[in-house]
Amino acid sequence: MGDVEKGKKIFVQKCAQCHTVEKGGKHKTGPNLHGLFGRKTGQAPGFTYTDANKNKGITWKEETLMEYLENPKKYIPGTKMIFAGIKKKTEREDLIAYLKKATNE
């Protein structure tokens, strides 16, 4: 799929202000993403989600993240994530490759 190192740079530039990835990492404006893959929307323990996130009911995997990261507010109307999204498919693939590794270590 994507390039992990390029994905890490994208995460630092576009995501790290609001999210952490390491096990036991703290929630910021957005939830800690450790254990993201295979988890349902709105389920990170200790984070307060909107009903829209809790009720979406999808499981995070490569395909759902590809769609979500392109336009979060379109994929989950009512989400409090203010990020506009990543339009370039290759950048989303790189970010997902990084997240797959970093949220599972």
UniProtKB/Swiss-Prot annotation:
InterPro entries: Cyt_c-like_dom (IPR009056), Cyt_c-like_dom_sf (IPR036909), Cyt_c_1A/1B (IPR002327). It holds the Pfam family Cytochrom_C. The modification N6-succinyllysine is found at K56, K73. The modification N-acetylglycine is found at G2. SUPFAM superfamilies: Cytochrome c (SSF46626). It is found in: Mitochondrion intermembrane space. Belongs to the cytochrome c family. Mules and hinnies are heterozygous, having equal amount of horse and donkey cytochromes c. Electron carrier protein. The oxidized form of the cytochrome c heme group can accept an electron from the heme group of the cytochrome c1 subunit of cytochrome reductase. Cytochrome c then transfers this electron to the cytochrome oxidase complex, the final protein carrier in the mitochondrial electron-transport chain. This is Cytochrome c. It comes from Equus caballus. The gene is CYCS.
